[in-house]
Each structure stands twice: as C-alpha cells, then as structure tokens.
Curated annotation (Swiss-Prot):
Disruption phenotype: Mutants lacking the tol-pal cluster suffer delayed outer membrane invagination and contain large outer membrane blebs at constriction sites and cell poles. Tol-pal mutants fail to complete division and form cell chains, and fail to process denuded peptidoglycans at the septum. A lipid is attached at residue 22 (S-diacylglycerol cysteine). A lipid is attached at residue 22 (N-palmitoyl cysteine). It is a lipid-anchor. GO terms for cellular component: cell division site; cell outer membrane; membrane. It is found in: Cell outer membrane. Part of the Tol-Pal system, which plays a role in outer membrane invagination during cell division and is important for maintaining outer membrane integrity. The Tol-Pal system is also required for polar localization of chemoreceptors clusters. The system also appears to be required for the activity of several outer membrane-localized enzymes with cell wall remodeling activity. It comes from Escherichia coli (strain K12). It comes from the Bacteria. Belongs to the Pal lipoprotein family. This is Peptidoglycan-associated lipoprotein.
Amino acid sequence: MQLNKVLKGLMIALPVMAIAACSSNKNASNDGSEGMLGAGTGMDANGGNGNMSSEEQARLQMQQLQQNNIVYFDLDKYDIRSDFAQMLDAHANFLRSNPSYKVTVEGHADERGTPEYNISLGERRANAVKMYLQGKGVSADQISIVSYGKEKPAVLGHDEAAYSKNRRAVLVY
C-alpha cells in the first residue's frame, strides 16, 4: 500500500519536473550576449582582423574577392576594359600576398559564332586576364586558364542583354 502511494507521487512529480526543466526563462538570456555570435572575430579599430590567423584572413579575403570576379568583354573583343582594372588589381594583390593560392580563369563567349571560334575567343579572353595579372606581379604558376566558349552561358537568351553577360572571363579560386 505504501509503495503504491510513492509510485503515484512519482508518476505525478516526474512529468511536472520534466516540463519545468524544458521550459526557458525569457529573462535568463537578457545579459546582452544573444545575437553576439562571431563577436570577437572580424575587423578591429585599425582595420585589421583582430584574432584571426593569417590563413583565416586570406580565406575571408578570397571569399570577398569571389563576390567580384567577372570581367566582361565587348563583342569579338578580348582586351581588358579600364572599368575592370581596379577589380583585377585587387585579385593580383591577393595572389601576390598569398602565393599558395591558385586561380583558374575561365573564358566564355556568347552563342554567336562557330564553336571553334568561341572556344578560341574564350581562350584569348582568359589569357588576357592571365597576362594582366602577371603584369601586376602574379606568378604564372598561380594562374591556369580554360575556355568554355559558348558551352556555359551565365544567362540564357537570344538578345544583347544575354549576350553581354555571356562574354566574360571568370576568376575561380
């Protein structure tokens, strides 16, 4: 009889304790730490990355460069336009500062022209970017090129807006 009373008491108390343990107190996390994930990493007041290793800094910088890694070309052209110089200079600075990193320059063309012509044009575009980077001091061993011609369009379409987005070279780390 005594054992039944104890068991009944436990059967009521255990679920109540489990529910109480699972509930959260909304005021408990009011110490200001919520939403501070990553606080301590990132830029310090001097513009440097406070407690990041040089490898982490290089990886972060590379990720930022990958946001701006496309050089566009005019129709049937492969010369680097002046509006892409600053972007390519940033890539060159990164590669010079990080000789262990390598980049592949992918050359592309729009769908007009024969496959052979477009492969050749894509190669000349990729090579133009490679030569620009080498002219800024990047080692030739860090740069490889490939041409896809018209085989990998960035934009599908048969108008000048699509064509202009497909005439490009892409820097891929």
